[in-house]
């Protein structure tokens, strides 16, 4: 799931016009996917984002607010825990790539990339 559209940002009003208010209540249903047992990882094919900083993505997954807080939350029911947010970028990504036996966590003998 793309971390660049799961919190309020300039493109969201245009998306809301296209999909409507009911669908926006479930916008980017990260929590729903995790709760259903889906292996969720962060990623994007959108190369025009101002920053690929994972800490911004982790913060906004947990708060569903713009970076630094404040304003209205986007699909507040889709907030996840800090541990779940870390997992998207670490162990879940390693599982998705089939490298969980050697990456995805900070442990002796693991590759850190």
How would you describe each model-predicted region?
Residues 2-113:
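His/Asp/Glu-enriched, well-ordered alpha-helical/loop segment
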């Amino acid at each position: 799931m793309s971390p660049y559209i799961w919190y309020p940002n300039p493109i969201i009003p245009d998306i809301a016009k296209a999909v409507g208010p009911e669908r926006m209540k479930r916008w980017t249903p990260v929590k729903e996917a995790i709760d259903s047992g889906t292996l969720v990882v962060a990623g994007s094919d959108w190369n025009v984002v101002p920053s690929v900083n994972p800490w911004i993505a982790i913060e906004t997954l947990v708060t569903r607010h713009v970076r630094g807080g404040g304003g209205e939350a986007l699909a507040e029911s889709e907030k996840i825990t800090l541990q779940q947010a870390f997992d998207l970028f670490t162990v879940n990504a390693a599982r998705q790539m089939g490298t969980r036996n050697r990456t995805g966590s900070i442990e002796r003998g693991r590759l850190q990339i």
